[in-house]
Amino acid sequence: MVDPIVTKNWRDLIKPRGLVVDQDSLSNTYGKFVAEPLERGFGITLGNSLRRVLLSSLQGAAITSVKVEGVEHEFMTIPEVAEDVTDIILNLKEVLLQIHTNDVKTIRIEADGPKEIKAGDLITDAQVEVLNPGHHILTISEGGRVRAEMTARRGRGYVPAERNKIPGSPIGTIPIDALFSPIRKVNYQVTNARVGQQTDYDKLTLEVWTDGSVAPADAVAFAAKIVKEQLSIFINFDEAEEPAEEIKPVEEQKLNENLFRSVDELELSVRSANCLQNANIKTIGDLVQKTEAEMLKTKNFGRKSLKEIKEILAEMGLSLGMKLENWPPKAAPQGGAPKV
């Protein structure tokens, strides 16, 4: 058991207020995430770790081999088919799959011309989902016929064709190099974050692009879980339980003195100040109880004003959407709060 005094090594470090997701740009293939404030240096430490794990360690699915009836190797052509086998293989590499099992799955093409074969025409079972059904694979002319069988499975990272060879496969089976990773790109940026009057903390901004088989937020969560599991082996002690914090009755809790200040003291832009006045918001305590959605419904109040207010409140350790019991209190604290 570790001495409680020693635990101050990590408990005294500042932690992010939470992970903020940019809802305006969020999609099934892109996400932008912000974590702040972080201790100096932790932005690069966490950003680089998450980026490397995202790119290398998340599982995805891909086609790993193909066998086309009448074809012995990838440099042949198929009668009445516009693409040669090499082009068909390149197109198969770009088929996006989601496989809901760890088993190797079989996918087939059975078609007669004239017909354009797209990813949505692949014959699969219920455990295989094609995510880009409009993706072009090959074109069959009049009188043409294609019968092909492919294997697909889940995996991690990039696997060259040589490693996708299956012993005992029928003659004519062509292994395909596979990119299993569902992550297409990861960027991170570290800038300064402010806590009170100090500006030497880190702000981590992480951007993630995926192929759509995994949501960006889930991808970040999976990567963080992998890092956590890998680091757990280095912890060789149990922590002493901290004594439960005494919960004071609401009326005894000390409120942030800034809550009692007038919104006029925030030195907002004229537009933002007028919006608060029109909404009958007089004190900072009145303001912080409003949610972002409620503020955006205020006449002439836009996202620029929202950003301005959120940044000023953050400097005071406050935020929108707070719940203040018994507000306003019977008596405001004596003296004023310092200006921002």
UniProtKB/Swiss-Prot annotation:
Pfam families per UniProt: RNA_pol_A_bac, RNA_pol_A_CTD, RNA_pol_L
Family, similarity comment: Belongs to the RNA polymerase alpha chain family.
Annotated protein name in UniProt: DNA-directed RNA polymerase subunit alpha
Sorted UniProt keywords: DNA-directed RNA polymerase, Nucleotidyltransferase, Transcription, Transferase
Domain comment as written in the entry: The N-terminal domain is essential for RNAP assembly and basal transcription, whereas the C-terminal domain is involved in interaction with transcriptional regulators and with upstream promoter elements.
Chemical reaction(s) catalysed: RNA(n) + a ribonucleoside 5'-triphosphate = RNA(n+1) + diphosphate
Residue ranges, annotated region (Alpha N-terminal domain (alpha-NTD)): 1-238
EC number(s) stated in the UniProt entry for this protein: 2.7.7.6
Function: DNA-dependent RNA polymerase catalyzes the transcription of DNA into RNA using the four ribonucleoside triphosphates as substrates.
Subunit structure: Homodimer. The RNAP catalytic core consists of 2 alpha, 1 beta, 1 beta' and 1 omega subunit. When a sigma factor is associated with the core the holoenzyme is formed, which can initiate transcription.
Assigned GO CC terms: cytoplasm; DNA-directed RNA polymerase complex
A GO molecular function held by the record: DNA-directed RNA polymerase activity
Tree of life domain: Bacteria
BP term (GO), one: DNA-templated transcription
Segments for region (Alpha C-terminal domain (alpha-CTD)): 255-340
Class of this enzyme: transferase
